[in-house]
Amino acid sequence: MRIAVVGGGINGLSCAWLLAQAGYKVDLYDRGKLASETSKASSKLLHGGIRYLEQYEFRLVREALKERDDWLRRVPSLTNPLRLVLPIYKNSKRSRWFIGIGLFLYDHLAGKSILPPSKWLSAKELLKIDSQLQSHDLIGGYEFSDGQMDDFKLAMWVAEQAIQIGVNVKENQPVDKVDVNGNLHVVGDIIHYDFIVNASGPWAVKLLEKSGITSPYRLDTVKGSHIVVSRKCEQSYLLEVPNESRIFFVLPWRENTLIGTTEVRQNLDDVVICSEEEKDYLLAAYNRYRKDSLKKEDIVDSYAGVRPLIYTAEDPNKATREYIIERDGKLLNIFGGKWTTALALARNVVNQLDRYCK
């Protein structure tokens, strides 16, 4: 059985790899280079997504926590465990008991994890860990576990596994359109497949529109921007954006500190960059928690990527991070998805194709 996978991000790569493992002959198409867009512009985290518990997305968080541990076990050379601190102040929007219940659920959903559970730290203990943390009105904080990765190198590792078992990778090969009968159109040619998997991420709906195919699902294309500053990160943090319900991360990254992310709706026809306003926003949020504040000159790098969120809310911060796999004839469309759950998503794709094709 011949399968075409459209999209060389982490979801497409994972689908191609596991489909080839299952015995399918797979061609993987990407309009540019593999993992060159959204998949290399993440927060570099392998995580369950503690904040998704606020949207009651227990299934997603459980799956992501299981997948987090699986990545850490499977590729230790490109991943590492991480202990993050979530400090709580008198004026924090989320109280100590609220965060405590959330982390209790997080630990419970993780099951028999390879990572240690969360624990409470007093203000005194936090300041002993990081003397530059803003101490005014500090109550204490929770320390909890997640994972970190080199997203681009890990995606390339998946690509290597796929290529080794026979996936035919076609880089710089844009797909013009597809149809529900298994026909894939590229410049100057129409190629027939037994099934096509549309794993083109933020461009999934756009490909359908170009193909004249309708779907009940919409994507909210949301830009997430990050800055890298020339400061060694001694402690990783999950922090509330001051005066907002949003959160952001402070993480170690190659002897520097990574700060992100933002959430700004993005037109796919526009250039995807971290704007000056976003840089100011992230610096201001970070500095509210520090005695040793940063200046714009401390920024040594910045990047941005577009996330394909299934449209479920006016506020993208409240949109689901779940994924949906939709079948339309000989076409499987993937909407949404997180980096951490890419292999779980791919297993679901394989299971669906096994039912339809075997």
Region roles according to the model:
Residues 44-129, 248:
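Dinucleotide-binding Rossmann-like beta1-alpha1 core, especially the glycine-rich loop
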Residues 2-27:
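N-terminal Rossmann-like FAD-binding beta1-loop-alpha1 element of flavoenzymes
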Residues 216-223, 232-233, 240-258, 265-358:
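C-terminal catalytic lobe of FAD-dependent flavoproteins
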Residues 198-213:
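Flavin (primarily FAD) binding-site architecture
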Residues 88-165, 170, 178-180, 254, ...:
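Flavin (FAD/FMN) cofactor-binding and adjacent substrate-gating region
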Residues 178-191:
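Conserved beta-strand-loop-beta-strand element in the redox core of flavoprotein oxidoreductases
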Residues 20-41:
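Glycine-rich FAD pyrophosphate-binding loop
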Residues 6, 192-201:
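Short hydrophobic core segments
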